[in-house]
Amino acid sequence: MANYFNTLNLRQQLAQLGKCRFMGRDEFADGASYLQGKKVVIVGCGAQGLNQGLNMRDSGLDISYALRKEAIAEKRASWRKATENGFKVGTYEELIPQADLVVNLTPDKQHSDVVRTVQPLMKDGAALGYSHGFNIVEVGEQIRKDITVVMVAPKCPGTEVREEYKRGFGVPTLIAVHPENDPKGEGMAIAKAWAAATGGHRAGVLESSFVAEVKSDLMGEQTILCGMLQAGSLLCFDKLVEEGTDPAYAEKLIQFGWETITEALKQGGITLMMDRLSNPAKLRAYALSEQLKEIMAPLFQKHMDDIISGEFSSGMMADWANDDKKLLTWREETGKTAFETAPQYEGKIGEQEYFDKGVLMIAMVKAGVELAFETMVDSGIIEESAYYESLHELPLIANTIARKRLYEMNVVISDTAEYGNYLFSYACVPLLKPFMAELQPGDLGKAIPEGAVDNAQLRDVNEAIRSHAIEQVGKKLRGYMTDMKRIAVAG
C-alpha cells in the first residue's frame, strides 16, 4: 500500500493540509441523535476506547466492545475493563456484522491487522471510525467503497475525555470524513453525532481532514509536546547538578516545574506564562527563547519535512517490523538517565519558585510552542489546528511527567508519539549543549535579581509576546474552553 498523502497531487495535498473550520455550536443542535438506535461497536478497550465508550453510552447510544477471542478467553485487561463497566463484549465475528458504526480505537501499529480483520465482517453501507488517521494517511489502508470512513479525535488523553464529560463539559475535538469513503454523503452527520456523544461539541470542534490531523498531530507530539519536554528535562537536570544543585532538588524543580509553568500557559497562553516572571526575568526569558528558536528551527523543520514526505512513518513502520528494536532500546536508555534515577526531594517548592528558578524552562516552552506552531503553519496547516497540536496539549503532557517523570510520559503517550519523541530528543540534546554551556547565573536554579529595566525594551518585548499569531488564535479558542477544569498545580 502507498502512503495516501503521497498519492495526491500538490493542489490536493495543500487543500487537505489546509482544511480547518471552527464549527458553530448550532451545528450540534441535534446532539448524538443521528446515531441513536444504531449499533456502535468499539474495537479496543484502552484509555480512549473505554472512556469514549462510557461517554457515548451516557449519551444514549448502544455501545458494545469487540475483542479478540484470546482476550476474552484469557480475561485480559481489555475484557475486564469492558465487562466491569457493564458493556456487552463479544468476538469480532459475533458483533461486527450487526454494527452500523465500527470504531477502531486500538494502537496505531495494530490498525492494519484490525481493519483487515473487521472489513470482511462489516455489513454493506456500515461506517468505520478512527480517532487518529495514521492508518489511512501514512499506511494508505484501502477501505471498501461502500464503507463510510470518519474520524473523531479528542485533543486530550482518554481519562480527560471522561472527566470533562462527567463535569458536563468536554474536550476540544477534531472531526473529519475521508474523501475517498463517503458513498452516501452521511460521513459528517456520523462524525458530528459521535463528537457530540463524547461531549466534544461543548468545548469546540474543528472540521478538519485526515491529512491535517495526522501531519499536525505527529509534528506536535514529536517536537514541543514530548520531544522538547524530554530534551529539556535531561539538559536542565544535568546543568543544575553540574553547578552544584542537590540532585533531588534539581529533579523536583524539573519534574513539577513543567506542570506548574504550563498551567499558566493553559489559562492565558504564553502571555500569562511570561507575566508570572519579574520584569528582568521576563526580558531574559525572551532573549533566551529567541536564541533557542534560531538554534532549533532547522531541527523542527526537518521533523516537519520528514512527516510531510512520509520519511518518518516509513522509518517507524520499519521498526515495527523489526520488533520495535529502536523504540525499546531508546526507552531503556531513557530509563537509565540521571534525571530518571535521581532521588526524590522531600521538601516543598512553592509555586512562584518554579517560575523564578525556571527561567530557562519557560524560555524552552515559549521557543518550542512558537516553533512548532510556526513550522506547521508554514507547511500549510491552519492556525487553529497548529494551536491544538502545540500549546493546548502541552499542560496535559507535562502532567504525566509530574506523576512519574519521563517514564510516565512515555507510557501514557502512543508508541507513535514515543518513537518520534526519541528521534527529536536524541538530536536536540547534543544540539543544545553548546547553548547550555553559555548560560548565565539566574537562568536556571537561581532567581534573577530585581533591578531596573529599560521601559522601551520591556514595552517592545511585551508587544512581541502578545502579538504572536499563536496568542491571537489561542485567545479565541480558549474562549470556548472557559469552563475547563484547572489542572492542579503540584507542590
Curated annotation (Swiss-Prot):
Catalytic activity: (2R)-2,3-dihydroxy-3-methylbutanoate + NADP(+) = (2S)-2-acetolactate + NADPH + H(+); (2R,3R)-2,3-dihydroxy-3-methylpentanoate + NADP(+) = (S)-2-ethyl-2-hydroxy-3-oxobutanoate + NADPH + H(+)
Required co-factors: Mg(2+)
Documented EC number(s): 1.1.1.86
UniProt-annotated binding residues for Mg(2+) 1: 217, 221
Top-level taxon in the UniProt lineage: Bacteria
Active site, renumbered: 132
Residues that coordinate or bind substrate: 414
Metabolic or biological pathway, per its Swiss-Prot or TrEMBL entry: Amino-acid biosynthesis; L-isoleucine biosynthesis; L-isoleucine from 2-oxobutanoate: step 2/4; Amino-acid biosynthesis; L-valine biosynthesis; L-valine from pyruvate: step 2/4
Pfam annotation, one family: KARI_N
Coiled-coil intervals: none
Function text: Involved in the biosynthesis of branched-chain amino acids (BCAA). Catalyzes an alkyl-migration followed by a ketol-acid reduction of (S)-2-acetolactate (S2AL) to yield (R)-2,3-dihydroxy-isovalerate. In the isomerase reaction, S2AL is rearranged via a Mg-dependent methyl migration to produce 3-hydroxy-3-methyl-2-ketobutyrate (HMKB). In the reductase reaction, this 2-ketoacid undergoes a metal-dependent reduction by NADPH to yield (R)-2,3-dihydroxy-isovalerate.
Protein name: Ketol-acid reductoisomerase (NADP(+))
